[in-house]
UniProtKB/Swiss-Prot annotation:
Name this protein carries in UniProt: Natriuretic peptide TcNPa
GO biological process, one term: vasodilation
Role according to the record: Snake venom natriuretic peptide that targets both NPR1 (EC(50)=1080.0 nM) and NPR2 (EC(50)=328.60 nM). Exhibits hypotensive and vasodepressor activities.
Family the UniProt entry places it in: Belongs to the natriuretic peptide family.
Pfam family for this entry, one: ANP
Top-level taxon of origin: Eukaryota
Statement: the UniProt record of this protein carries the keyword Secreted: yes
Keyword Cytoplasm included in the entry's annotation: no
Main location: secreted
Misc. remarks from the entry: The synthetic glycopeptide is highly stable in rat plasma even after 48 hours. The synthetic non-glycosylated form shows similar stability. This stability is probably due to its C-terminal tail.
Organism: Tropidechis carinatus (Australian rough-scaled snake)
Amino acid sequence: SGSETAKIGDGCFGLPIDRIGSASGMGCGSVPKPTPGGS
């Protein structure tokens, strides 16, 4: 919840900041999360 936080790149690295953003790959436009759990 809150893709704005994921855009920073934190959720991109796998940090538990935004599971939805990192899991969906919205937070990382160039590096989508390979793990569908945001972990």
